[in-house]
């Protein structure tokens, strides 16, 4: 028996159940991935025992010499990966990375211009229920409701009228390439700071599959646990002129002690992301997403914007007479994990929605390619068309389990 099974059998049993769920199912949530065993090992390492408030060379506690080495390595690796001048790897999440940037250059009631949450944005980009929409005056752009793509001309007009202090570019449910150069030019024209939140596409930006904002925007924020395939956490990239204020905004402005076991795991993830193998992985993520999009479209499922350029597809379920919530539950019964999602022209609550978001990072990490995406797309379409058919869900669940067994989550983990 493991130490955990002996000490806390209840939690051990829950973890075993979650392990089996992941092993036997298909994770298609676009913000999820499967970390390497090396990242898992670092995340659960003895580094968790140490308090390390401050930064390398300027800690408030003794005994941090090896934590300094780990954090410096993480900072150096992510700067090298993205070609950045400065990195802060201490934010516990992407939202906290965004918060630190706001705290650096904004005062309460300053104006933010960012993407509307219901059309693909993120809570921390100025949603009225989030700190970013409570502390600051939030203005939001959306997509062109015909093309369902960003209209940079309209965004520029809004920026000229609103004159925001910050323009945020980035999304959590936008399947198309983002023109960071256009955002940088708009920001420069109106005298705004430009913040690129690449949480979803960081792995694609790091490998050149998607254009990177680094060197164009004032700040770049991200998570490490989506397409970067690292531990749960965030980071900030900026030029050296903002290094000191950004670091001060993170600590002591926003956080106390950093999670050093997670920072060690971030360092591992940045090393992995610099390899040729990771670039091939990132290329396959996009190939898989496009194949799934084509399969779904061929089966009568309308895709928001008509397809995808990245790791995710956004499905419009309106013509099938079911909600995103109903589809999420039906697919979940079949062992396919997705999430309900709002779509442009949304008429339903965000807890119900008219759409689904599906992504390929996790299944690609398991080794699946185009042929598997075609099969998965067929399963999704079949369940969407007949969402009340529990016998169909049970049949597909067995087929999903069979497919998943061919691509072990971790070959040495049972």
UniProtKB/Swiss-Prot annotation:
GO biological process entries: glycine biosynthetic process from serine; tetrahydrofolate interconversion
Superkingdom in the source lineage: Archaea
Cellular component GO terms held in the UniProt record: cytosol
NCBIfam families xrefs: PRK00011.1
Chief localization: cytoplasm
Name this protein carries in UniProt: Serine hydroxymethyltransferase
Assembly behavior: Homodimer.
Key words of the record: Amino-acid biosynthesis, Cytoplasm, One-carbon metabolism, Pyridoxal phosphate, Transferase
Pathway of action: One-carbon metabolism; tetrahydrofolate interconversion; Amino-acid biosynthesis; glycine biosynthesis; glycine from L-serine: step 1/1
Record-stated family: Belongs to the SHMT family.
């Amino acid at each position: 028996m493991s130490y955990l099974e002996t000490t806390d059998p209840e939690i051990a049993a829950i973890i075993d159940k979650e392990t089996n769920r992941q092993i036997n199912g298909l994770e298609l949530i676009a913000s999820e991935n499967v970390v390497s065993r090396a990242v898992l090992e670092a995340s659960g390492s003895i580094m968790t025992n140490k308090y390390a408030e401050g930064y390398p060379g300027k800690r408030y506690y003794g005994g941090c010499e090896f934590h300094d080495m780990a954090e410096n390595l993480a900072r150096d690796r992510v700067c090298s990966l993205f070609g950045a001048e400065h990195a802060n790897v201490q934010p516990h999440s992407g939202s906290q990375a965004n918060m630190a940037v706001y705290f650096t250059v904004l005062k309460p009631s300053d104006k933010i211009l960012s993407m509307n949450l219901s059309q693909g944005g993120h809570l921390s980009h100025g949603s009225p229920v989030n700190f970013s929409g409570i502390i600051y005056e939030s203005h939001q752009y959306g997509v062109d409701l015909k093309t369902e793509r960003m209209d940079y001309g309209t965004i520029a007009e809004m920026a000229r009228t609103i004159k925001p202090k910050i323009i945020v570019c980035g999304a959590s449910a936008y399947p198309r390439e983002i023109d960071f150069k256009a955002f940088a030019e708009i920001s420069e024209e109106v005298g705004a700071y430009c913040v690129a939140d690449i949480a979803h596409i960081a792995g694609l930006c790091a490998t050149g599959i998607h254009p990177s904002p680094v060197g164009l925007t004032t700040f770049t924020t991200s998570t490490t646990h989506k397409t970067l395939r690292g531990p749960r956490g965030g980071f900030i990239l900026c030029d050296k002129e903002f290094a000191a204020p950004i670091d001060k905004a993170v600590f002591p402005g926003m956080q106390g002690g950093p999670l050093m076991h997670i920072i060690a795991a971030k360092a591992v993830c940045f090393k992995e992301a610099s390899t040729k193998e990771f670039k091939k992985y990132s290329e396959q993520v996009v190939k898989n997403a496009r194949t799934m999009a084509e399969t779904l479209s061929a089966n009568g499922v309308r895709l928001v914007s008509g397809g995808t350029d990245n790791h995710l597809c956004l499905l419009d379920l309106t013509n099938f007479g079911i909600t995103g919530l109903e589809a999420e539950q039906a697919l979940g019964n079949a062992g396919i994990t997705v999430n309900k999602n709002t779509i442009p022209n949304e008429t339903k609550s965000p807890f119900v929605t008219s759409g689904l978001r599906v992504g390929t990072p996790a299944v690609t990490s398991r080794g699946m390619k185009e042929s598997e995406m075609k099969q998965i797309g067929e399963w999704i379409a079949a369940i969407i068309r007949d969402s009340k058919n529990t016998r169909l869900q049970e049949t597909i669940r067995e087929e999903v389990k069979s497919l998943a067994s061919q691509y072990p989550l971790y070959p040495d983990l049972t």
